[in-house]
Structure formats: structure tokens, C-alpha cells
């Protein structure tokens, strides 16, 4: 089952930004319980040039269904607001 998701932000604090960990909101997932079923799944972002950057969902973020995904390499800023595919 493939799910689309939106890249919301980098994982960050007031002074630090972790560019290889992204906060992703899967579409039609609205609770922490539904999001926890996605842990361990593969996340793929396709760049405008056609490269595929792969990551893995590592944990839930918050109570509204967002998740954290750790990528092999950091995603560029142009990925923010873009769609990813959760496999």
C-alpha cells in the first residue's frame, strides 16, 4: 500500500536544524495510532532532476499523525512542501 505525504519541515530546535531528519504528514492519517503503523516504512522523494532520495520512518511526531523520517542524505530546502511516497 502506497501513501502520499507532505514534507513539513526539518527536525529542528531553536538553534539547530537536522537536515537528514524530516517531519512528514501522511495524507489521510490523522492520529498518533494510525501514524505508528507506518514506522519502519520506506520514504522516497524524487528530485526535479529525477534522483531518488530514500529514507525510513523512525518515529511518530506529535498527536495529529505526523511522522519523522531519517534520510540517507539530507533533503534540500526545495523538498519542503513537496510530496513524498511512503511504501
UniProtKB/Swiss-Prot annotation:
SUPFAM superfamilies: Translation proteins. GO terms for cellular component: ribonucleoprotein complex; ribosome. GO terms for biological process: translation. The keyword Signal does not apply. Keywords: Ribonucleoprotein, Ribosomal protein. Pfam families: Ribosomal_L35Ae (PF01247). PROSITE patterns: RIBOSOMAL_L35AE. One of its GO terms (molecular function) is structural constituent of ribosome. InterPro entries: Ribosomal_eL33, Ribosomal_eL33_CS, Ribosomal_eL33_sf, Transl_B-barrel_sf. Belongs to the eukaryotic ribosomal protein eL33 family. PANTHER family: 60S RIBOSOMAL PROTEIN L35A. This is Large ribosomal subunit protein eL33. The lineage of its organism: Archaea, Methanobacteriati, Methanobacteriota, Thermococci, Thermococcales.
Amino acid at each position: 500500500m502506497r501513501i502520499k505525504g507532505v514534507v513539513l519541515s526539518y527536525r529542528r530546535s531553536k538553534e539547530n536544524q537536522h537536515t537528514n531528519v524530516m517531519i512528514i504528514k501522511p495524507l489521510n492519517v490523522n492520529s498518533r495510532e494510525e501514524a505508528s503503523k507506518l514506522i519502519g516504512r520506506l520514504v522516497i522523494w524524487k528530485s526535479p532532476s529525477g534522483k531518488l532520495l530514500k529514507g525510513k520512518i523512525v518515529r511518530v511526531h506529535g498527536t495529529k499523525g505526523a511522522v519523522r523520517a531519517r534520510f540517507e542524505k539530507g533533503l534540500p530546502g526545495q523538498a519542503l512542501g513537496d510530496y513524498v511516497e511512503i511504501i
